[in-house]
Amino acid sequence: MTLKIRSAVKKDFKDVLGLNRSMYAEFHSNPNFGDFVFLKQSSRQRMLKWFNTLLQDVRKDNALYYVAELDGKVVGHCFVRRESPGSELSHVGVFSILVGKDHRKMGVGKKLLDHAIKESRGRFEILHLRVFKQNKIAKALYKSRGFRSFGVAPKFIKRKNSYIDREYMYLLL
């Protein structure tokens, strides 16, 4: 079993859709998972539009998009999207990552993050991300790669009847 990190392509959509849909199921069993979720799961059509727009942003040099592939199946993905192309924020990349539940704690997230950081150098000057304040595992990974916290938005997300604080982190490239 060899893990391969590569650029995302159109044929990855089915696996990416499966990963994103499994994320919705996980929110019910793990209230501290993720950053936020839409109240209603996105349709296949809406997800395809998001996916194609992200691939277009890659072609325009406004995003990087990678998948982690294990035995021919996408088990995780991450992207860095330019904060605001053509503006005074175009040097900032917004990082996002998702690793399938069955492939966590196997180094997939580390490899995706390391690859994204490496490829971001020279394209962006700053990476930033958001994470649930109580997500100690994700925050430890980000801190181990040099990310620093720059603030917390209390009660930023309301999930069912409870609130979750959102933490913001950045990395100077």
Residue ranges of each PLM-predicted region?
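A short beta-loop-alpha structural element at the N-terminal edge
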Residues: K4-G18
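Short glycine/proline-centered loop/turn elements that form peptide/ligand docking sites
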Residues: G109, L113, Q134-A138, K155-K160
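Acetyl-CoA-dependent GNAT
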Residues: R21-Y24, L39-D102, L113, L172-L173
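Conserved GNAT acetyl-CoA-binding A-motif
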Residues: S120-R130
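Conserved catalytic-core motifs of GNAT/GCN5-like acyltransferases
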Residues: R82, H128-F132, K143, R148-D165
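Terminal substrate-recognition subdomain of acyl/acetyltransferases
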Residues: Y163-L173
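A short gly/proline-enriched turn/hairpin at secondary-structure junctions
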Residues: F27-Q41
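Conserved acetyl-CoA-binding loop-helix of GNAT-fold acetyltransferases
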Residues: S96-V99, K105-E119, K139-S144
